[in-house]
């Protein structure tokens, strides 16, 4: 096995000390002749600097830490692309960890990111990790919470989120405009984004002189629970003698499961029931599924920019949702 070239080999080739090589590689002061000899030795020996050693001397690595709750959501793919593009442009490595929605694991992963002295942290974790994230920010590591707003953030703690109430309002207005009147909602639980989207749905219905009954909203925290949730909504509507003519899903990661639950029951979209969900994905156009989109790529870029060029004061950035109308709500029939 070939021996890895070391900084000592470069120093010997250039005829200088290892301290001089380190200084040149890190942009320190050196004469032009010395720098030329060092870089020539680096090139000829194909030397790769040790990022770990650099991090030790700098007191921080050059990696940008990202803690994701659930990579099954289409939202996170665009988010990661945006983060990676900014990191690459700033000579940073992206260190990604997926928590699988396990809060204890989330806390551990944020702690480990801190222990690895990442350049900064972008996190989509539960509120119960905020004390650890806040601790990192207070100790000089820029942190960005994505998908919700940080409460009373200290310097160094920022947030990038969506207008979730606006997303819910867009859902309600589109379904109403498509002539739907008996609407059920599948949401994924108590996350601020889910609560605010349902609140937006209610607001829009109220403004149109309608209401969204409590029993018209059901929670499914996992894909396995979705079939039961859809069945419950259909049964409740039938009991009220107002069969559902629309179903809204406020969590993009549950889209496939909700769509499957409807079609498995022989329900035709949109003839029997309109279907509207969050977050666009690769096969949505082929199936004609209408969606409320959030600009995940732009959100990822902005989050990473807050890490690589951190502002002095906390920043909270809110992006606007958009409707992509296809045909799953009966749009063509209403043209």
Report the location of each language-model feature.
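Short beta-strand segments enriched in small/hydrophobic residues
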Residues: 18-22, 56-72, 174, 182-188
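Flexible loop/turn connectors
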Residues: 235-335
């Amino acid at each position: 096995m070939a021996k890895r070239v070391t900084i000592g080999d470069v120093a010997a080739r250039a005829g200088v000390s290892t301290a001089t090589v380190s200084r040149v590689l890190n942009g320190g002061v050196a004469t032009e002749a010395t720098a030329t000899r060092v870089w020539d030795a680096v090139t000829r020996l194909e030397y790769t600097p040790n990022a770990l050693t650099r991090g030790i001397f700098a007191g921080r690595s050059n990696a940008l830490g990202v803690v994701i709750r659930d990579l099954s959501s289409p939202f996170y793919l665009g988010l990661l692309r945006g983060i990676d593009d900014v990191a690459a442009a700033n000579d940073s490595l992206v260190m990604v960890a997926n928590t699988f929605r396990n809060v204890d694991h989330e806390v551990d992963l944020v702690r480990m990111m801190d222990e690895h002295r990442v350049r900064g942290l972008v996190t989509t974790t539960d509120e119960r990790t905020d004390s650890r994230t806040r601790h990192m920010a207070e100790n000089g590591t820029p942190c960005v919470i994505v998908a919700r707003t940080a409460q009373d953030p200290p310097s160094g703690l920022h947030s990038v989120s969506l207008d979730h109430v606006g997303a819910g309002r867009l859902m309600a207005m589109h379904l109403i405009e498509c002539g739907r009147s008996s609407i059920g909602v599948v949401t994924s639980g108590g996350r601020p984004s889910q609560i605010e989207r349902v609140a937006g749905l209610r607001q829009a219905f109220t403004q149109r002189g309608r209401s969204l009954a409590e029993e018209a909203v059901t929670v499914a925290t996992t894909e396995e629970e979705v079939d039961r949730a859809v069945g419950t909504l259909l049964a409740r509507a039938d009991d009220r003698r107002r069969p559902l003519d629309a179903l809204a899903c406020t969590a993009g990661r549950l889209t496939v499961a909700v769509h499957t639950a409807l079609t498995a029951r022989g329900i035709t979209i949109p003839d029997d029931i309109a279907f509207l969900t969050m977050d666009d994905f690769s096969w949505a156009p082929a199936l004609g599924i209408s969606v409320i989109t959030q600009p995940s790529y732009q959100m990822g870029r902005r989050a990473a920019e807050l890490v690589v060029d951190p502002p002095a004061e906390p920043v909270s950035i809110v992006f606007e949702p958009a409707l992509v109308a296809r045909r799953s709500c009966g749009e063509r029939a209403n043209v």
